[in-house]
Swiss-Prot record:
One of its GO terms (molecular function) is peptide-methionine (S)-S-oxide reductase activity. This is Peptide methionine sulfoxide reductase MsrA. Keywords: Oxidoreductase. It comes from Clostridium botulinum (strain Hall / ATCC 3502 / NCTC 13319 / Type A). Belongs to the MsrA Met sulfoxide reductase family. Pfam families: PMSR.
């Protein structure tokens, strides 16, 4: 099994979208690459912790490759917008690809390069090693499964 953490705006929609993909075996939402240990949702939303709302993904590489997974990720975000996705604004809504395995970096860089060909503006999606990931509060986990019709900036149909 492989792991990656993806930030694409509000984590509810990213998790719901990713959980529907064949080969994804586990998803969790949380806060990635900030400066405060174990922050609360309110602290992250204040913008002072530096965390991104993100989705931890465990996937079966024999069913879906990282390249395929990233292609699906690119399709649900606007990678040219800084600190904003849909109606959500703030540093916690930035886009990012946070890797746990250094061997994945070449695939990520190649994928970002290929995606850039679709845009005139530069892609601002961060590509960094995962420094930290704190699981979000339980009520955020599988939020759109628990609350069908809840807010989502991603078209899930």
């Amino acid at each position: 099994m492989k792991e990656i953490v993806l930030a694409g705006g509000c984590f509810w929609g990213v998790e719901e979208y990713m959980s529907r993909i064949e080969g994804i075996v586990e998803t969790k939402v949380g806060y990635a690459n900030g400066i405060k240990e174990n922050p609360s949702y309110e602290e992250v939303c204040s913008g002072v912790t530096g965390h991104a709302e993100a989705c931890y993904i465990k996937y079966d590489e024999s069913i879906i490759s990282l390249e395929e997974l990233l292609n699906k990720f690119w399709s649900i975000i606007d990678p040219t917008v800084l600190n904003k996705q849909g109606n959500d604004r703030g540093t916690q809504y930035r886009t990012g690809i946070f890797y746990l395995d250094e061997k994945d970096l070449n695939v990520i860089i190649k994928s970002k390069y290929q995606e850039q060909k679709n845009y005139r503006k530069p892609i601002v999606t961060e590509v960094e090693p995962l420094k930290c990931f704190y699981e979000a509060e339980e009520y955020h986990q599988k939020y759109l499964k628990k609350n069908p019709g809840g807010y989502c900036h991603i078209h899930l149909d």
